[in-house]
């Protein structure tokens, strides 16, 4: 693979979070696990986020792959912005090169509850797929599968949006969606349709099929 090729997996994430990363890091509490280093507003949050990331990495790898992932050569930095009314979202970036994947970085934001039960599982699932396949997945499959591990409240949003998009002609034709290698300008239908299709396939074959 082209040594210059890098692939960032980006979930819905306000640009403001990326601009705040440096300021958050300056006043953040730190916590380290085997595979993650966490910067969060408080020591307790940093520990909760790090421990949840490790648990999700272990449990979700078993669900999807049937086995745990080996330890990464370098830990993935997690930058967390946590506030009660902050919209949930995250962005995970990494690099594919020569059949290897490395350079993990994760930015997450939201309320404590949504970070722990939705954002972290979603972003960790991206890293599991990247570690296993070592090449980019179709956008619909990657994002669609990752949304299936979120909290029921987030899944319900995807299902409501799917109906809305189909009724308002914002849906994406399947032949276009299957061919997408980048995010479309109107990205929310990709998430909703990807979730619906991934959910259907999982119900038919299971996660490890």
Regions found by a protein language model. Give the residues of each.
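An active-site-proximal "capping" alpha-helix that borders the catalytic cofactor pocket
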Residues: 60, 141-152
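Bacterial N-terminal signal peptides
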Residues: 11-22
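N-terminal secretory signal peptides that target proteins for export/translocation
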Residues: 1-9
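Residues on a specific face of well-ordered alpha-helices
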Residues: 123, 143-147, 196
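Active-site-proximal alpha-helical
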Residues: 171-209
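Juxtacatalytic substrate-recognition/specificity segment
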Residues: 27-138, 155, 171, 180, ...
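Short helix/loop segments within enzyme catalytic domains
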Residues: 149-173, 201, 206-209
């Amino acid at each position: 693979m082209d040594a210059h090729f890098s692939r960032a997996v980006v979930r819905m994430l306000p640009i403001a979070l990326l601009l705040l990363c440096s300021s958050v890091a300056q006043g953040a509490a730190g916590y380290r696990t085997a595979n993650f280093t966490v910067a969060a507003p408080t020591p307790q949050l940093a520990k909760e986020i790090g421990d949840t990331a490790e648990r999700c990495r272990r449990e979700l790898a078993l669900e999807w792959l049937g086995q745990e992932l080996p330890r990464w050569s370098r830990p993935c930095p997690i930058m967390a912005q946590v506030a009660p009314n902050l919209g949930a979202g995250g962005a995970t970036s990494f690099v594919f090169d020569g059949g290897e994947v490395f350079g993990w970085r994760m930015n997450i934001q939201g309320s404590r509850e949504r970070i722990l039960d939705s954002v972290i599982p979603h972003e960790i699932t991206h890293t599991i797929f990247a570690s296993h396949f070592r090449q980019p997945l179709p956008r619909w499959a990657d994002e669609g599968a990752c949304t299936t591990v979120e909290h029921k409240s987030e899944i319900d949003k995807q299902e409501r949006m799917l109906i809305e998009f189909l009724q308002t002609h914002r849906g994406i034709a399947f032949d276009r969606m299957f061919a997408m290698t980048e995010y479309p300008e109107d990205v929310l239908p990709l998430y909703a349709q990807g979730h619906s299709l991934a959910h259907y396939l999982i119900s038919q074959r299971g996660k490890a099929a």
